[in-house]
Amino acid sequence: MKKVLYIAFNYNHDTGIASKRIRGVSKYLPSFGWNPVVIVPRTSNETVEIDNVKVVETDYQDMISKFMPKSNNTGRKREVSGRDQTNRFVSKSLSLAGEIFAYPDSMKYWKKPAFEASCEIIENEQIDAIMSTSSPVTSHLIAHELKEKYDIPWIADLRDLWNLNPYINHNFIRKFFEKRLEMKTFKNVDVLVTTTEIAKQTLKEIHPQKRIEPVVSGFDEEDFKNMKQTRKNEKLTLMYAGSLYSGKRDPSILFDSINQLICENKIDKDKITVDFYGDETNLAELSRKYDIEDNVKIHGRITQKEVLTHQMNSDVLLLISWMDESEKMFIPGKVYDCMGCKKPVLSIGYREGSLKDLIEKTDIGYHVSDVDECKKAIYDYYTKYNNENLKYCGNEFADEYSMKNTAKRFAQILEEIL
């Protein structure tokens, strides 16, 4: 059995979608002839134990608390006081400090202990290949230095692009240094991996000579093996889990659509509810604007396991994306949970792109980009719910999006670069 050293900062995280791809690949690589040795930071998270996966914890100094103020966002309006103004100044100052000192990311102090632990493993075990996954990009810096020292084949998995990530807004000075660092880091990489074909073409613009392979994610069937809906909802229940990225993912189309359908007497205001699990970016204020505050329930962040439980007990799962052309390259990991839960999907986002193509290919629901389309989708789901025939309609293509197939593709690439 061959061995791959896997630099994966988020392996143990249980509140983010990133860990699902990492753990899924680690779990199923042994089925295709590769045993992973996963390098992770020692944090408060418990180590996830998976058969045939060796996890090595390293020392880790957290930097983020030095630069990021604790959030006190309750979703309620507050009067602006002198103290608020001071806090805003402090927040901006900390943000600027982060631009300077948290370069290339706030996990930079993990690089040294992770590199040293990796060297020890390589020198004492037969490591055939290296994989690194971002974010954080520090993972790739570690792999780059290992590649330089040992000349072992290396795959860099970019779950999100580095400099071409529209969700990260650096100043022009930081952008200059980031791009230079990306070019230097990937100079000796064997294969760059993205999550979609569009992301591959985008990355090709700055790495035209590199081999780039799109490897989509998927759902792990075992996560859903013993899960089932435990209650019947008295209202059509829509659910969204995750971040709204400070308004980039805007639920206005959803709220406006529900409001219009209620005003048109097409749906009963007392027969629909929307649950949000995650951050609270303007949700309360926005729901009041559209007069549906009684229909919108705002909850805090929960673990991935809790997310799946709530998804199983919801009727329709929401995906809300940024209404920007750059969003075309993304497929949010949550869509694979929708397939695993076998729940209908309502996706709201840019009019075209990877996500829309996937939803249409698999027939798992609707992808809409304006209020009229959204109203039609909600009304269709509402009517089917009232007639007790609302169900998941994913076709045979949906079953192809499994973590086992994702790991299989990584194993194929690993074999090709030996």
Language model features: what each stretch is:
Residues I198, G218:
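Carbohydrate-associated surface elements
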Residues K269-T273, L283-L308:
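Nucleotide-activated donor-binding/catalytic signature segment of Leloir-type glycosyltransferases, i.e.
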Residues M1-I64, V191, E197, I212, ...:
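N-terminal subdomain of nucleotide-sugar transferases
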